[in-house]
């Protein structure tokens, strides 16, 4: 690919949760499109491997700790003198059950990662981008769980709904600086979080990625026979990161769900 065709040529990006899954796929795609990528994660060995494979760098980052996120942004500024894209992708889930048995301490831990981690990322990326004077793109990983009930545990759903809200408010504040803030809501992408959830829901501890993919392909989208992939989400992130592709899009939640949250496939017979 010629440099002129690379949608993120000479851009600098930080991806939290970049060591595997959606984050790692996005790190590779951003690099292919000309970006220098900093992989920020608590998974050191996996993070280093991803960073080395793409010619980027790894930084240990627990997003629940504001100082870690600030240090990742400072690393970008020291190494490259700029930050163009912040992908707040790190997240976690819980082995949840009934609201009546909720462990509030565990909920607080989840919120510290899924919500506070996003707030930390937006805060420090915005500071760097405003200082740079070039604007930028901030992207946050949400979930279809933040859009409708029955797709995730109570605390997980709470956290993803919160992300959608803060994306809208920060887009409102930061737009005057040329900073776009958007979210992505994946559904039916067999990441570790989703596979573990299916194991619990189906009471099948040995359920593997291929089996979960088959279940999603059959029942989890309007595109029968097609499950989501981490590459699908990475392409959505690339779209939102690129000024040429999405320069007039902010405060938006891009849903990558095969149409699942738009309609019910169980009623398809009415169109026959």
Swiss-Prot record:
Binding-site residues, substrate: 143
Binding site for NADP(+): 14-38, 160
Entry's Gene Ontology molecular function annotations: identical protein binding; oxidoreductase activity
Expression by tissue: Expressed specifically in tapetal cells.
Enzyme Commission number: 1.1.1.-
Main EC class the enzyme belongs to: oxidoreductase
Record bears the keyword Iron: no
Stored SUPFAM superfamilies: NAD(P)-binding Rossmann-fold domains (SSF51735)
Coiled-coil region(s): none
Keyword annotations from UniProtKB, A to Z: NADP, Oxidoreductase
Keyword presence, Ribonucleoprotein: no
InterPro entries referenced in this protein's UniProt entry, alphabetically: NAD(P)-bd_dom_sf (IPR036291), SDR_fam (IPR002347)
Catalytic-site annotation from UniProt: 156
Role, per record: May play a role in tapetum development.
PANTHER family referenced in this protein's UniProt entry, alphabetically: 3-OXOACYL-(ACYL-CARRIER-PROTEIN) REDUCTASE (AFU_ORTHOLOGUE AFUA_6G11210), SHORT-CHAIN DEHYDROGENASE REDUCTASE ATA1
Family the entry assigns: Belongs to the short-chain dehydrogenases/reductases (SDR) family.
Protein name in the entry: Short-chain dehydrogenase reductase ATA1
Gene: TA1
């Amino acid at each position: 690919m010629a440099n002129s065709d690379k949608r993120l040529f000479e851009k600098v990006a930080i991806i939290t949760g970049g060591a595997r899954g959606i984050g790692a796929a996005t790190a590779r795609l951003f690099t292919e499109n000309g970006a220098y990528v900093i992989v920020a994660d608590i998974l050191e060995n996996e993070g280093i491997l991803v960073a080395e494979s793409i010619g980027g760098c790894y930084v240990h980052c627990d997003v629940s700790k504001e100082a870690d996120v600030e240090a990742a942004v400072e690393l970008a500024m020291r190494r490259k003198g700029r930050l163009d894209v912040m992908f707040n992708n790190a997240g976690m889930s819980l082995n949840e059950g009934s609201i009546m048995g909720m462990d509030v301490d565990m909920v607080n831990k989840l919120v510290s990662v899924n919500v506070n981690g996003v707030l930390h990322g937006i805060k420090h990326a915005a500071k760097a981008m405003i200082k740079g004077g070039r604007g930028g793109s901030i992207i946050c990983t949400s979930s279809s769980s933040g859009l409708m009930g029955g797709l995730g545990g109570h605390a997980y759903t709470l956290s993803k709904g919160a992300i959608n809200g803060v994306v809208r408010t920060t887009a409102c504040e930061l737009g005057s600086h040329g900073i776009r803030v958007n979210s992505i809501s994946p559904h039916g992408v067999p990441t570790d979080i989703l596979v573990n959830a299916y194991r619990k829901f189906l009471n099948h501890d040995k359920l593997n990625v291929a089996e979960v993919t088959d279940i999603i392909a059959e029942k989890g989208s309007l595109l029968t026979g097609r499950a989501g992939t981490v590459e699908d989400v990475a392409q959505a992130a690339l779209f939102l990161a690129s000024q040429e592709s999405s320069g007039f899009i902010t405060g938006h939640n891009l849903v990558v769900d095969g149409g699942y949250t738009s309609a019910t496939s169980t009623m398809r017979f009415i169109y026959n």
